[in-house]
């Protein structure tokens, strides 16, 4: 019975290949390579690296926004625009 349950919940190799292909299409470096297939291990490492770089970029943008807001009059039209964008 447990083998039935695990076989129903398992993902087919075709589904895994499709997911890997979709993941590859999301990475900027993979798009430049075109149709070349990277190994799954390399693709996952590139994905982790890309996610880390996105985190750093978000942190940097957050710091820049904080600096910008700190130097602004909180009642100014510019501050109101920024607040509305963040909602």
UniProtKB/Swiss-Prot annotation:
<comment type="similarity">
    <text>Belongs to the bHLH protein family.</text>
</comment>
<dbReference type="GO" id="GO:0016036">
    <property type="term" value="P:cellular response to phosphate starvation"/>
</dbReference>
<dbReference type="GO" id="GO:0005737">
    <property type="term" value="C:cytoplasm"/>
</dbReference>
<dbReference type="InterPro" id="IPR044293">
    <property type="entry name" value="PRE"/>
</dbReference>
<comment type="subunit">
    <text>Interacts with LO9-177.</text>
</comment>
<comment type="function">
    <text>Atypical and probable non DNA-binding bHLH transcription factor that acts as a positive regulator of brassinosteroid (BR) response. Controls lamina inclination by participating in two BR signaling pathways involving BRI1 and RGA1. Involved in the RLI1-dependent modulation of leaf inclination by promoting lamina joint cell elongation, especially in response to phosphate (Pi) availability.</text>
</comment>
<dbReference type="GO" id="GO:0005634">
    <property type="term" value="C:nucleus"/>
</dbReference>
<dbReference type="GO" id="GO:0046983">
    <property type="term" value="F:protein dimerization activity"/>
</dbReference>
<dbReference type="GO" id="GO:0009742">
    <property type="term" value="P:brassinosteroid mediated signaling pathway"/>
</dbReference>
<dbReference type="GO" id="GO:0006355">
    <property type="term" value="P:regulation of DNA-templated transcription"/>
</dbReference>
<protein>
    <recommendedName>
        <fullName>Transcription factor ILI4</fullName>
    </recommendedName>
</protein>
<dbReference type="InterPro" id="IPR036638">
    <property type="entry name" value="HLH_DNA-bd_sf"/>
</dbReference>
<keyword id="KW-1070">Brassinosteroid signaling pathway</keyword>
<dbReference type="Pfam" id="PF23174">
    <property type="entry name" value="bHLH_ILI"/>
</dbReference>
<keyword id="KW-0804">Transcription</keyword>
<keyword id="KW-0963">Cytoplasm</keyword>
<dbReference type="GO" id="GO:0009741">
    <property type="term" value="P:response to brassinosteroid"/>
</dbReference>
<dbReference type="GO" id="GO:0051511">
    <property type="term" value="P:negative regulation of unidimensional cell growth"/>
</dbReference>
<dbReference type="InterPro" id="IPR011598">
    <property type="entry name" value="bHLH_dom"/>
</dbReference>
<dbReference type="GO" id="GO:2000024">
    <property type="term" value="P:regulation of leaf development"/>
</dbReference>
<keyword id="KW-0805">Transcription regulation</keyword>
<feature type="domain" description="bHLH">
    <location>
        <begin position="1"/>
        <end position="54"/>
    </location>
</feature>
<keyword id="KW-0341">Growth regulation</keyword>
């Amino acid at each position: 019975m447990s083998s039935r349950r695990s076989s129903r919940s398992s993902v087919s190799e075709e589904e895994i290949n499709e997911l890997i292909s979709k993941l590859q299409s999301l990475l900027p470096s993979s798009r430049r390579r075109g149709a070349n297939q990277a190994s799954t291990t390399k693709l996952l490492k590139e994905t982790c690296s890309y996610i880390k770089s996105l985190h750093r970029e978000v942190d940097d943008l957050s710091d820049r926004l904080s600096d910008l807001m700190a130097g602004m009059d909180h009642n100014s039209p510019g501050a109101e625009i920024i607040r509305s964008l963040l909602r």
